[in-house]
Structure formats: structure tokens, C-alpha cells
Amino acid sequence: MRALHVPAGSATALLLPALQRVLGGSDPALVAVPTQHESLLGALRVGEQIDDDVALVVTTSGTTGPPKGAMLTAAALTASASAAHDRLGGPGSWLLAVPPYHIAGLAVLVRSVIAGSVPVELNVSAGFDVTELPNAIKRLGSGRRYTSLVAAQLAKALTDPAATAALAELDAVLIGGGPAPRPILDAAAAAGITVVRTYGMSETSGGCVYDGVPLDGVRLRVLAGGRIAIGGATLAKGYRNPVSPDPFAEPGWFHTDDLGALESGDSGVLTVLGRADEAISTGGFTVLPQPVEAALGTHPAVRDCAVFGLADDRLGQRVVAAIVVGDGCPPPTLEALRAHVARTLDVTAAPRELHVVNVLPRRGIGKVDRAALVRRFAGEADQ
């Protein structure tokens, strides 16, 4: 296995031809790494032997321990790209607006290889500049046109009329990296943007469920205890650095750390409820952050929010909310937000502590860093 360093803004020039060779079987397995992350090379054992059918090793978005490295075959990557194009209405040109060394960016590049097109790339190493979107989208030319974003990028684009209008010209804007707040989705729909909510991870070659419906060839189950299991042609072979218990232990299936529900059995629409390791145990009840965040997000003064648990002597954990207040809005009180949440959820889920912040910490391609919030506000509580 070899490494390919990807300097900011150079994915199309460096990574696209390498992917073409890897997918065609003429080059050994590849791991794409940013130039500042030399430590990944040793952790993923670059230069050592790997199975012949592995095309890409992709780092996962975990926050602790050594990188596991999902081993993706050319067959899995091709199946994912083909199924995505089938669902979206056919191959097209792609705007690369997420980091190319994460699975979302790599998936854009693989789809481009399969489609025989060259993506237009935005350099997002210094942040997502929405003023560059109109020109970048214009450069995609004619035919079907797509991009993949995270919710925070979509929210930022919606603040700029020209960027909003440009996104509305695309055939689909895939949103991944975690759930998108309902107000953002509603605003995008009102602006004529075709949003496709995706669910997936490095272990599934990227998004494998679109708007709750699995792509062709993808299978879903909900296990005892509520965890989502994913099977099918897009699965990784396993991890470069195996873990115990092994989520790939059941042949043909990957057991995720996500909790979900399937409407009308295994062939129905998937609702992702949250991560098992983020559940809050409070007063004998279990509260998942995501439904509480969805409820908070409908309050007119809340522009962004995150929910997490902090240790509590009486309850075990208490539900805590950190919010970013919308422009021109007075900060809501804790009592007002508790009442707002209790209109749609059990009062147990209503936050017992509120923090107003300027921005939420994020990791990877834009996921909220709850662990950072826990560290910050647990420290304040101890003072």
C-alpha cells in the first residue's frame, strides 16, 4: 500500500489519475492523506503488504485511538458510484467542495472516474468561501450536475443569494456528515435547491442510504438494541487495524454504532435516531441528542445547536444544550427552550442547562464535536 499526499486544492490534478489506475487494477492500494498528517502513514502501515483487491484505505471519523482504516475494494467503490448515479438520474459532472481525503470527497472523485468526467474543485482548506460557488458551478458546464456538502456548508451558502441561486441550478446537492437541521432543509427547499439527505460512512464507501431509502444493492437491518446493520456490495472488507469487537464479524454485514428504525420492516425507510455512544442516561431514561437538536432547531432564535450529557449527582447525567443564536435575535432563556422542546418530546429530553456560544466546535468534514463541548463545559461546572 502506498500513500498519496494531497495538498490543498490539488485533488483533481493528483488524486484523480491515481484513482483511475487503482480502480483499473494497475496500481497498488492507495491511502490519501493531507500533507500535515505524517503520523497516519505509520498508523496505517503504509508500505506493508495488503490484500490485492483493496483499492483504497480510508480513515474513519472516530475521535479516539489509532485510525482503523476502512479497506475498500474497487468493486465496492464502483458499486457505490454506479448505485448513486442510478438513484440521482444518471452520471454527471461533480463539484468537489469537501476534503478529498475524507470518504465524502473520495466518493465524489470515484463517481467522476466512473462517469468519465473531471470534477471542478473548490479549495476548502482555509474554509468554505460561498462567493466562489457561482463561478465553480458555472464551470461544470451542461448536462447533469451535482455536489456533496455538509449541513454547515449548506447553511452558510443560504446566507448568500448568489450562492443559493447557483446551488438551485444543480440536479442534486447531497448532504452528509450528520443530520441537517430542519430549518436549513426547509430554507433550501424554498430556494429551489434539490437536497438529498445521505447516510453512510467510510465503511460503506460513503453514502449508501438516500433520503432514508437504501441504494440498489444495499441491505439494512435493525439489530436487537436498535443498532443499524448495513450489508451489500458497497461494504469495506474490514479494517486495516482490526478492533474488538469486530463490527464486520457477521459475514456480509457491518454493525454500525448508530441507532435507527426501519418503517415497515427491513425493506422500509430508515430513520437514523443517533449514535449509541452519545446517548444520555438521565434519571433512568435514555435521551438521544439528535431528536432534541431537531426540536431546538425549530425555535426561531436558534441558528445552530448541539446537545450532550454532563455528569449529575442526582440524575446520573443531565441534558445540556449549546446554541448559536440567530442574527438579530435575543438569546432565548432555558425555560423557553425547555417549553419548546416539551411540545414535541417528553419533558425528560428538555435541556436542564443552556450555554450560548458563538460557534460550535466541529471535526472531520463538519460533524459537531460533542466531546469538545463536554470537556469545555464539564470544566466550567467543576470550577
UniProtKB/Swiss-Prot annotation:
Q: Which InterPro entries match?
A: AMP-bd_C (IPR025110), AMP-bd_C_sf (IPR045851), AMP-binding_CS (IPR020845), AMP-dep_synth/lig_dom (IPR000873), ANL_N_sf (IPR042099), ATP-dep_AMP-bd_enzyme (IPR050237)
SUPFAM superfamilies per UniProt: Acetyl-CoA synthetase-like
Q: Does the keyword Ligase apply?
A: yes
PROSITE patterns according to UniProt: AMP_BINDING
Q: Which UniProt keywords apply?
A: ATP-binding, Ligase, Menaquinone biosynthesis, Nucleotide-binding
* Record-level Gene Ontology MF annotations: ATP binding; o-succinylbenzoate-CoA ligase activity
Under catalytic activity, the entry for this protein gives: 2-succinylbenzoate + ATP + CoA = 2-succinylbenzoyl-CoA + AMP + diphosphate
What residue range is the signal peptide?
A: none
Q: Which domain of life does this protein belong to?
A: Bacteria
Enzyme Commission number: 6.2.1.26
If you read the UniProt record, what top EC class would you report for this enzyme, in one word? ligase
Q: What else is known?
A: Was identified as a high-confidence drug target.
Q: Which NCBIfam families match?
A: PRK07824.1 (NF005877)
- What role does this protein play? Converts 2-succinylbenzoate (OSB) to 2-succinylbenzoyl-CoA (OSB-CoA). May be involved in the biosynthesis of menaquinone.
* Name of protein: Probable 2-succinylbenzoate--CoA ligase
Biological source species: Mycobacterium tuberculosis (strain ATCC 25618 / H37Rv)
